[in-house]
Amino acid sequence: MKKNNGSFGSIMLILGAVIGAGLASGQEIVVFFARYGFVSIIFAFLCFILFAYGLYELMKYGKFKQKLPDFSKKYKNNFIFDSCEGFIFLIFSATMIAGAESLLNEFVFKFDFKLWSLLILLFAVIVSSNGLKRIIKVNKILVPLIILSTVAISCLSFFFSPHSDFALSFDLSNLAFLGVSATLYATCNLMVANKITIELGGKIEEKQMKKIAIFSSVILFVIIALIIVALLVNDNSVLFASLPMIYLAFMINNTVGYAYSAIILFCIFTTLTSTLYSLSQCVNTKVKSKSFSMILSALAVFVLSLFGFDSIVRYSYPLIGALGIIMLFTIKNRTTCEECSCGQNSCQLK
């Protein structure tokens, strides 16, 4: 990877994949954190630790594949592992298209019209087809704007929208559920960025890995914590909205609402380019034509997106989180000295 992309480009690539429609709209935050009350912020920090550790392990795995040809060849085609990866990227890509559909139909155009989601999918296909470098270039522009806008909406909501004391709860009875929820959310997001992070690991300096993992995770934690607070201190109806942060933005001001709707579309696009790229890479292991792999992936994504945004997030994401735990343990196991067969007390990659 070129020096000018550096750590900043890598962090923006990872965050662009993770901060999709589900996170920036608040829907994921309600499902995994905010519905349990104010104490969920503590568990968002647990998510930060797990996410940072997972990112580092994924990048290290990418370095193994790049430095050890025999290691890469050994795990090149694993049907079960590859199928799980493909399923995960299909779900995430479909969620982004369904999120775009929900956003445009409910808050912007007020009617059901598939053309907009098809256009977003088409643009994502064009960018994804040009590889990781093009995705990084796009993310370096869009992701800082997404982060600043999400932080701004969260902060503005403290001053310009009706508040409620109902959600300001420190209910400790949900601690067990929150622990599981935070773990699932961390692994869920690691799965979104799984393929691109592994590929990234093979292209960056080893000394950059920890810095990229920590900074990406800190930014993610700050965004999650701010969204949790914004959702909990505002009107009770916010938690029950299909796109809570959009709903909150419109409560502040109609202009703010429409502006943030555009930001959510950027979120959808950055995540979709990463997940669609990853999905086509999975399909490409079985279908040798890269172009046909991309077309096949895009068609599958569009069909699955017809099930709707809310249904996909509520029922598929926890399952993906559970799958993610198994896959991360598999990756961790592969990167032990026994697996790389170096026959030394310390791994040759260190």
Can you say where each PLM-predicted feature lies in the sequence?
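Transmembrane-helix boundary/entry motifs in multi-pass membrane transporters
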Residues: K2-N5, A34-V39, Y61-L90, E106-F113, ...
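Hydrophobic alpha-helical segments and their helix-loop junctions in multi-pass secondary transporters
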Residues: A21, L90-S93, I97, L145-D171, ...
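Juxtamembrane transmembrane-helix boundary signature
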Residues: F43-S72, V229-A230, N234
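Extracellular/periplasmic helix-exit of transmembrane alpha-helices
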Residues: L55, L184-Y185, S216-L248
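Membrane-interface loop-to-helix entry segments
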Residues: A100-L104, F113-L119, V127-F158, V313-I331
